[in-house]
């Protein structure tokens, strides 16, 4: 075993005074996090339409960046022994986004129930303002070493997730 210290997430500005340590985390959030992507040739099929699998990559990027914006670096989270795989995915495709257009990817952690994180998703075409994809993605915290669902999120992660409610 290595003597090097285990990685840690930075402490939440709320500090150790947060009551999350003693209770299960359950929350509902209303804030949307957004990133923009200009559609490149590698995002599309031969017809210049965004390939459906690309949307999943964009949504994951937006979730990871949303977590990073509140102090949860995904790589550090995994090093701490907590991974967040997708366990449920439901997307509805409304219309295509095409090569050269800009996609606005919006994610919102809608609900937190213990170790289950439910995300609402929207992808909108910037040029038209029309929704192209909507859906819901559910993540569950697991211990990757054991391959089992965790009983609760690490307290420091819970504290950071509460920032999404503010």
Swiss-Prot record:
GO terms for molecular function: fatty acyl-CoA hydrolase activity. Its EC number is 3.1.-.-. SUPFAM superfamilies: Thioesterase/thiol ester dehydrase-isomerase. The active site is at 45. Keywords: Hydrolase. It comes from the Bacteria. The keyword Hydrolase applies. The keyword RNA-binding does not apply. CDD domains: 4HBT (cd00586). Belongs to the 4-hydroxybenzoyl-CoA thioesterase family. This is Putative esterase sll0410. It comes from Synechocystis sp. (strain ATCC 27184 / PCC 6803 / Kazusa).
């Amino acid at each position: 075993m290595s003597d090097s210290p285990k990685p840690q997430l930075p402490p939440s500005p709320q500090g150790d005074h947060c009551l999350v340590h003693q209770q299960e985390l359950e929350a509902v959030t209303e804030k949307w996090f957004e990133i923009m992507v200009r559609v490149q040739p590698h995002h599309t099929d031969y017809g210049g339409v965004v390939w459906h699998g690309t949307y999943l990559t964009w949504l994951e990027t937006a979730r990871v960046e949303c977590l990073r914006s509140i102090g949860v670096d995904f790589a550090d989270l995994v090093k701490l022994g907590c991974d967040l795989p997708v366990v449920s995915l439901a997307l509805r495709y409304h219309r295509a986004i095409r090569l050269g257009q800009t996609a606005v990817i919006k994610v919102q952690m809608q609900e937190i129930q213990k170790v289950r994180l439910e995300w609402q998703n929207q992808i909108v075409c910037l040029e038209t303002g029309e929704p192209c994809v909507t859906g819901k993605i559910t993540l569950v915290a697991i211990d990757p070493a054991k391959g089992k669902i965790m009983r609760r999120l690490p307290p420091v992660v819970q504290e950071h997730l509460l920032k999404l409610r503010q």
